[in-house]
Amino acid sequence: MRLHGRARRAAVLTGAALLVTGVLAGCDSPSSARPDQAGPGQPDWKRCAAPEGGTEPGDAWRCTTVDVPLDYAKPDGDTIGIALIRKEATRKSERIGSMLFNFGGPGGSGVDILPRAAGSYQKLNTRYDLVGFDPRGVAGSSGVRCRDDKEQEEALRGIDMTPDTPAEEAAFVEDGADFGAGCARLSGTVLPHVGTTNAARDMDAIRRALGDRKLSYFGISYGTELGGTYAHLFPENVGRVVLDAVVDPTADTVGHARNQATGFQRALENYLKDRGQDPEAGTRRIAEMLRRIDGDPLPTSSGRRLNETLALTGIVTPLYSRSSWPQLTQALDEAENSGTGDGLLQLADSYNGRDENGHYDTQSHSQRAISCADTRARPTAAEARALVPGFRELSPVFGPFLAWDTAGWCARWPVEGEHDTPEASAPGAAPILVIGTTGDPATPYEGAQRMADELGEGVGVMLTNEGEGHGSYGGSGCVTSLVDAYFLDGKVPADGRTCS
């Protein structure tokens, strides 16, 4: 279970807005013009069906599928359908074009998430069609499946993700191999083709199908890696692009894990200080609690037991958003003082995509498939074990888990990965707004700085949000007003601007 952003929050968060000053984002606006090259045919928009486990999004939304090559090296071969959802601009006479969204994961379904998050983007929707999509290998776009609910439940209950004995380590390694074998068995046709580079090519096909001369795009979390890859492949087609909660494009598998150990420890310490607790003492207390749970899982009212992995997941979940910190306080109090795991288990279930009936969504399947298609790294259990002491120094709570995760993720994966780190240089592209939040646990602030540098001088425009949480639009009035002015008026903030 790799730490990620599930992008489930759809509420509007408000803050103080600041006046915007800046230069225009070039002479071109990303208006809907004739496609610049041949591509998919005109989309046939129809009423949307309810997503798995969800409800119909409503009459304002329409859905379609755009067919693209399964293998871009064989453009005349088999195709894969990319699922789209759209809500048209409310001021049609002032329409700028389409705005494509990716909310992260990888593995998040834009078709599912965008209607629930659309309230946060009402101002942008006045002049843009809001468009979400399921990247290849996700949900409605030939979503990857690797195991059933029973197998998923047994793995979360029975596999120790921080193994302490040879037997636990052997089971940990075998579970990773079994998961990959399940993906190959159930989704073998699509599995070699679900990487981020292909998803970026799909985005350009979507742009052409929508009739937009330039791509307007809002990428969050993993969506920033996808956006950086798109800018590298198609710099001439970049319109107005915002990358918020940025994945470090210079980090490899171990580097990402190290970044997250640092980021989540920083967020935990900020949480503890906010609660009037000493960060070092609080960290030691939580680490000791996890050690006890590893040996003796906590009971819950459902009859399920809260093991160390689920407890850690329950702690991780509310650190993504400061507004969820009270839930963490209550859940920790239950676990530490009442000896019950209900609160942490509920948070873990939300993170893991488990509903009250025991059904799991498949975001974690898609996430793993996409990540392992991207990265060539295949660390062994022995290599992960050697990382544990150093990672524990970075974070006594999260470090050991993240060290072991480097091996549990893609070892013995049935498909080779594409690269060590993604390419994001985009010479000649229009200015891209890159937003980093200083207290972001999942994609630490430094990754945004590196993305801005990688995009190149005059392309990456750095905006700092001094705050907590994973993602800043809607949570910071300053950031929100700057992003709105950029998308709606083409005003590019000064590089290095800070929102406090």
Regions found by a protein language model. Give the residues of each.
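Alpha/beta-hydrolase-fold enzymes
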Residues: 276-371
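Secretory targeting and sorting signals
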Residues: 1-30, 66, 203
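Gly/Pro-rich cap/lid or specificity-loop segments adjacent to the active site
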Residues: 29-310, 369-371, 375-500
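Generic alpha-helix initiation/capping and coil-helix boundary signal
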Residues: 4, 8-9, 14, 324, ...
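Feature targets compositionally biased, intrinsically disordered low-complexity regions
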Residues: 4, 14, 21, 25, ...
